Amino acid sequence: MAGRLLVLSNGHGEDLIALRVLQCLHQRHPELEIAVLPLVGEGSAYAPLEQAGALRRIGPRRSLPSGGFSNQSLRGLLADLWAGVLGLSWRQWRLVRRWGRSGDPVLAVGDLLPLLLAWASGAPYGFIGTPKSDYTWASGPGSAGVAALYHRCKGSEWDPWEWGLMARRRCRLVALRDRFTARGLRRHGVAALAPGNPMMDGLQADPLPAALEHQRRLLLLGGSRMPEALGNLRRLLGALEDWDPQAPLLLLAPCGSRPAPAEWEPLLRGLGFAPERIPDGTGAAAAWRRGPVQLLVGSGRFAAWAGWAELGLAAAGTATEQVAGLGIPALSLPGPGPQFK
């Protein structure tokens, strides 16, 4: 399977999902030349695979004030416009058009923006639709209200202009996150598949160390966008201050490259935590304690630690969905970040 592939993704969660797909694709077809254009942010999630020589990031990239959520608020949109989002999008569009002239395929991961750019390339394209599920309006707390009625009338969380792009002849693949959503799009003439949700791949928990077996275990998810992540973690930890646990409590705080350990220290010291020895077998980068509460911080430890948790306390996006997908209850505390606007 020689050739080239351009991958478009529009957000940190989408980058992680695309990364998981590309890891498997590279294992099966190491001769395939993979180029990645992150439409939102720097695409730092791709760095390990890029360093391994499996792909390369191309094109203009910039971290925007809204974090990719300019459609959630007028303030976010205006901030992105001031930061030059129109010029950035124009340069990205031109790059995709140049790629399309070669006839090499494009894979879009996300929602409307990468799907639209993939269609505009003029080349064959595929689409992995990550953010939308018909379960959000068909049942449960989200099944009432104007938005749910709108989706129910359409018969899909996806909008007509989106499924119109998915139904084009040049669109060779449409993969969605669940069978229920795929079935809704098939009624609109889209050959949608639901082969599985990539965000749930690779979440193989390490064995729980014996030293942690007798502690209650809570997973803290502050998100990956700075500086909101530190503020989110401060709120999550603050929400636990009045709780007097009847048993020793372990807080697991996996993170990415940010916040870095040095960025954690002033936050934790300000909340009365003191550093202590890291328990064996945890893979933590740092350990802190305040009375009966122990907190472990670990970069890149989400996949290993998520399965240890009895409860998730979250202000994150994709990671919150992954925890719920593992069957672990998750409480989401909306914060001031752009994803909650």
Locate predicted features:
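Nucleotide-activated sugar donor-binding and catalytic core shared by glycosyltransferases
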Residues: 1-341
